[in-house]
UniProtKB/Swiss-Prot annotation:
Binds 23S rRNA and is also seen to make contacts with the A and possibly P site tRNAs. Belongs to the universal ribosomal protein uL16 family. It comes from the Bacteria. This is Large ribosomal subunit protein uL16. GO terms for biological process: translation.
Length: 138
């Protein structure tokens, strides 16, 4: 599963996910892309589940790029622990997703195969997404 190798600090503040994606919002590597329309968080498990769904559908053909990385730790306190006594331990990592962010890209497959693979992947994600075809000159 995806997670950072090292972090300067183990825990991070919650923060707010605002605005639109200004970087990583175009198809850069492949021919087709899956773009986030909504905003939210994707856990490392969700990113991996979507990748597996796509990989299984396209079988041996094509190449997939994951354009997001879960680098924000989310901490949780154990069950039935009283409030106070500090912040909980990091349990998992998430990627903060803004509208317009390119999530996955694909190349080396037909458009209908890519469309179906992205549809299967989108079913694993808690965000609204759109299928994007690379524009000429972009």
């Amino acid at each position: 599963m995806l997670q950072p190798k090292r972090r300067k600090y183990r825990k991070e503040q919650k923060g707010r996910n605002t605005g639109k994606a200004t970087r990583g919002n175009a198809v850069s590597f492949g021919e087709f892309g899956l773009k986030a329309i909504g905003r939210g968080r994707l856990t490392a498990r969700q990113i991996e589940a979507a990748r597996r769904a796509m990989t299984r559908h396209i079988k041996r053909g094509g190449r997939i790029w994951i354009r997001i990385f879960p680098d924000k730790p989310i901490s949780q306190k154990p069950a039935e622990v009283r409030m106070g006594n500090g912040k909980g331990n990091p349990e998992y990592y998430v990627a903060e997703i803004q509208p317009g962010k390119m999530l996955y890209e694909m190349d080396g497959v037909t458009e209908e195969l890519a469309r179906e693979a992205f549809r299967l992947a989108a079913a694993k994600l808690p965000l609204k997404t759109a299928f994007i075809v690379r524009q000429l000159g972009a």
